């Protein structure tokens, strides 16, 4: 009997936690440490060994020029008037990210992208390419065989898509030759930068840190929490390892609807609320109303001819309409689902949402990307 009661208590606790409107995230998922970041590297190089899919020399003269320079550095002399027609060489841009606290000799991944009119980089080998930082210093050397996705034609919605074969990757293709010096552990001040500005979350982070480390954290603004610690590597590492694992209870998210007009994609979060309004668009009319007697939201959706709109709107004003199509769960998701089921085009759907926002019944931030 006691085991059954304990099991019921456990299930109730789980249900309560699932029904909660708040959730917790660790500080490491909400912030980054100022000054500790990746550094971008870039270089120009040549790929050889292509199966006739390289640059056309007449269209990309810089490929031949680069090949001449490389061969001369290797001690190979080519007459200046020689016009080489090579189809197995391509000029490329090589990019990589140098992680923080990287050491000499470590390997990092690189991305290789064609500069000219090469048809494919498949089967090619990148020759030794220096990678430079923003200060024009060489931080890594890249070389190796390129991994390119297989070219498959995919048919979707009567359109044919092909995998990109003019770029590829080299896993562990660059070796770090120079380290980036940081001032970590040399200053008493550490700034935590929030991934998304929010005064409430910044203050919560500061308060929770001060519980574990009193008088340490201060919320400077909606984006920065400042830590006052000791200028010592060991102390700061130990302190940050503990701070980053502190749980922060998160408030409700900002109500937001994100729309991509090019693809017709719509993303809606659970905080979006609807108010009472009427939206008329083309042959579609939407009534969204809160029914006080049932203490719930419901909406009536009807498709009308143009000559029926006037009588429909009059009936709505006088509350003399038939509520046989009402849906009790008045979420924006349901309205979008019903509109989609009736064959509403994406641009019409986006226009309706914008009208609902303008009418004041869509209580959310409408973001068009």
From Swiss-Prot:
The yes or no answer to whether the keyword DNA-binding is present is no
Q: What domain of life is recorded for the organism?
A: Bacteria
The leader peptide range reads 1-24
Q: Where in the cell is it found?
A: Bacterial flagellum basal body
Alphabetized, the UniProt keywords read: Bacterial flagellum, Signal
Q: Name one GO biological process term.
A: bacterial-type flagellum-dependent cell motility
GO CC terms: bacterial-type flagellum basal body, distal rod, P ring; outer membrane-bounded periplasmic space
InterPro entries xref list: Flag_FlgI
Q: Which GO terms describe its molecular function?
A: structural molecule activity
Protein family (similarity comment): Belongs to the FlgI family.
Q: What does this protein do?
A: Assembles around the rod to form the L-ring and probably protects the motor/basal body from shearing forces during rotation.
Subunit note: The basal body constitutes a major portion of the flagellar organelle and consists of four rings (L,P,S, and M) mounted on a central rod.
Identification of the protein by name: Flagellar P-ring protein
User: Organism source for this protein?
Assistant: Buchnera aphidicola subsp. Schizaphis graminum (strain Sg)
Q: Gene encoding it?
A: flgI
């Amino acid at each position: 009997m006691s085991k059954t009661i304990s099991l019921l208590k456990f299930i109730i606790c789980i249900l309560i936690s699932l029904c909660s409107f708040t959730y917790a995230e660790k500080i490491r998922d909400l912030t980054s440490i100022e000054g500790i970041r990746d550094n971008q590297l870039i270089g120009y190089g040549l790929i050889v060994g292509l199966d006739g899919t390289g640059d056309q020399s007449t269209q990309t003269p810089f490929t031949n020029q680069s090949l001449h320079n490389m061969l001369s550095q290797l001690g190979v002399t080519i007459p200046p008037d020689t016009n080489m027609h090579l189809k197995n060489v391509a000029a490329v841009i090589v990019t990589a990210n140098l992680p923080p606290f990287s050491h000499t000799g470590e390997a990092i991944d690189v991305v290789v992208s064609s500069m000219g009119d090469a048809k494919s980089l498949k089967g090619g080998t990148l020759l030794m390419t220096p990678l430079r930082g923003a200060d024009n210093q060489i931080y890594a050397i890249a070389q190796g065989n390129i991994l390119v996705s297989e070219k498959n034609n995919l048919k979707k919605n009567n359109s044919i898509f092909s995998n990109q074969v003019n770029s590829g990757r080299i896993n562990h293709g660059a070796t770090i030759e120079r380290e980036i010096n940081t001032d970590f552990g040399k200053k008493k001040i550490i700034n935590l930068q929030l991934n998304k500005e929010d005064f409430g979350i910044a203050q919560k982070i500061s308060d929770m840190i001060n519980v574990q480390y009193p008088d340490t954290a201060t919320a400077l603004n909606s984006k920065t929490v400042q830590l006052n610690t000791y200028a010592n590597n060991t102390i700061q590492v130990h302190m940050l390892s503990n701070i980053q694992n502190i749980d922060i209870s998160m408030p409700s998210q900002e109500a937001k609807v994100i729309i991509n007009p090019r693809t017709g994609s719509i993303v809606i979060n659970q905080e979006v609320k609807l108010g009472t309004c009427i939206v008329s668009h083309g042959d579609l009319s939407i009534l969204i109303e809160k029914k006080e007697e049932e203490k719930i939201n419901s909406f009536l959706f009807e498709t009308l001819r143009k000559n029926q709109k006037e009588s429909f709107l009059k009936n709505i004003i006088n509350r003399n309409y038939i509520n046989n199509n009402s849906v009790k769960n008045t979420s924006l998701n349901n309205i979008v689902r019903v509109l989609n089921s009736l064959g509403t085009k994406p641009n019409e759907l986006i226009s309706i949402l914008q009208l609902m926002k303008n009418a004041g019944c869509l209580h959310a931030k409408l973001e068009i990307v």
